Amino acid sequence: MSTYFDLIMIPLQLLIVFFTIYYFTLSFFGLFGRRPEEKIYDEQKTFAMIVCAHNEEQVIGQLVENLYLLNYSDHLYDIFVVADNCKDNTAQIARQAGAIVYERFNDNEKGKGFAMDWMFQRLFEMERQYDAVCVFDAGNLVHPDFLREMNSRLCKGERLIQGYLDSKNPNDTWISGVFSISFWVVNHVWHLAKYNIGLSSCLGGTGMCISTDILRRHGWGATCLTEDMEFTMKALLEGIPTTWAHDAIVYDEKPLTFMQSWNQRKRWAQGHFDVANRYIGKLFVKGIKERNIVVLDGIINLFQPYFLFLLFLSFAVISINFILSIQMSYMLFYR
């Protein structure tokens, strides 16, 4: 019996050891300082600030007003709100706050990914064209220097950039507090660490900046539950890594209750598995063919939910083996 369990446990344990060493080693590069960088604060780039909102009348006005207070020339950026299948006053409140509002109604293609794809197409048809788009959630607040930091990164040639995801409400409940801590940790031991050693980070759904050249050339096309992860991997296949802007800060609202956090995590996990199933093979082939460590590292990013599953499976196998061992010992002792 133990031989069969060994056949299961040894590969599992080897994988767990590999990922543990990987995460442990990677974290050190995010704990001890940051990669030196020269910042370019000469305002050169133009931005389309896009907010996809579904029934967000309670918060959309505050975000639009906040975006108009950024430390960046007003004529270099415009604020667009996509009122996506809204049944409340989101569009009206956004207009009153000064945003350019587009209303979208589509019962067949629902979700943020579809709304973004729809809005990008309209951006490209406008007379005014922008150097980059920045995407936010309706419940966000944005640091005044956000666009200055993104402008600096774009001027240095970066094309796909994720900003620092801070917490808007860490003290509201213990759930929001735990979420906030997890994001603070991940920002340093994952995103910053990867940026410091030249690996690709990952888009986080909000606070992200995308060069319009990328969108024109490759399209958006990311419409699954985790459209940010999907586009990250799509871009990586095209040789475009995601960089990390540690000083471009966005304050994101975290879940307040256990059920809110559960539903959010479940949605993220479903989307993560979906993207992993579609992109791991493609990334592996490209990474091996080109001997590209950045692309191969993207596989580890996608493998995270499987790693958690392996931990659960390992615990289950150990528990079963322990119970069976006790039963066998009991039978031998009293035989």
Region roles according to the model:
Residues 45-48, 78, 230:
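Cell-envelope/extracellular polymer assembly enzymes that use nucleotide-activated donors
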Residues 83-91, 106-108, 141:
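A conserved acidic beta->alpha catalytic loop
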Residues 1-9, 13, 30-41, 197-199, ...:
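Basic/Trp-rich segment in TM-proximal cytosolic loops or flexible interdomain/linker regions
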Residues 1-65:
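N-proximal low-complexity "stem/linker" segments adjacent to membrane-targeting elements
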Residues 105, 109-128, 144-225, 266, ...:
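Long helical/loop segments within the catalytic core of UDP-sugar-dependent glycosyltransferases
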Residues 65-76:
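Short, acidic, metal-binding catalytic loop of nucleotide-sugar glycosyltransferases
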Residues 61, 88-95, 103, 145:
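Acidic helix N-cap motif at the loop->helix transition within catalytic regions
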Residues 127-141:
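Short beta-strand-to-loop acidic/aromatic patch adjacent to the donor-nucleotide binding site
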